[in-house]
Amino acid sequence: MSHALRRAADRALVPIGYLLLAVAASWPLARDFATYTVGDVHYDERHAIWVLWYTAQAIAGHVSWPDTTHLLWPHGISVLVDGVGPLNGVLALPFWPWGAAAAFNGVALTGLALSGWCLYALARTVGVSRGPAFVAGALFLLWPIR
């Protein structure tokens, strides 16, 4: 195997590994991906789904961005200061064809996998070797509070 091919395989296997770990850690999210949302506080889930939907509508040009009077009418609010935020709205875009629950769960799963991968990248940047860096990312992904 050439050096470039091995390097490309290493770069692909790490995020795939974190994605598989995120699926295992969040089970049964993958099984119920388009039908149920994860979490215990249902009003938070509904609010988050609304922000994801509003971001998709803004990207499509159907609503104004970033201010809306749909919340806190008549004064409105900027969705940029919301905890869900526009980045999650962008990450949800590929999952919308499967419905609102899939968009919410897709963002949750993507965020979980990316948290491990980003800590891996940070550890590699500061000189930690691949194995311990992967373990550090896995521990961060599995940690209950981020």
Task: Give residue spans per PLM region.
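Start-transfer (signal-anchor) and selected internal transmembrane alpha helices
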Residues: 1-29
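Membrane-interfacial loop-to-helix junctions in multi-pass inner-membrane proteins
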Residues: 4-10, 37-41, 124-131
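Membrane-interface starts of transmembrane alpha-helices
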Residues: 9-13, 95-107, 128-136
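Membrane-embedded helix bundles of polyisoprenyl
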Residues: 18, 24, 107-126, 130-146
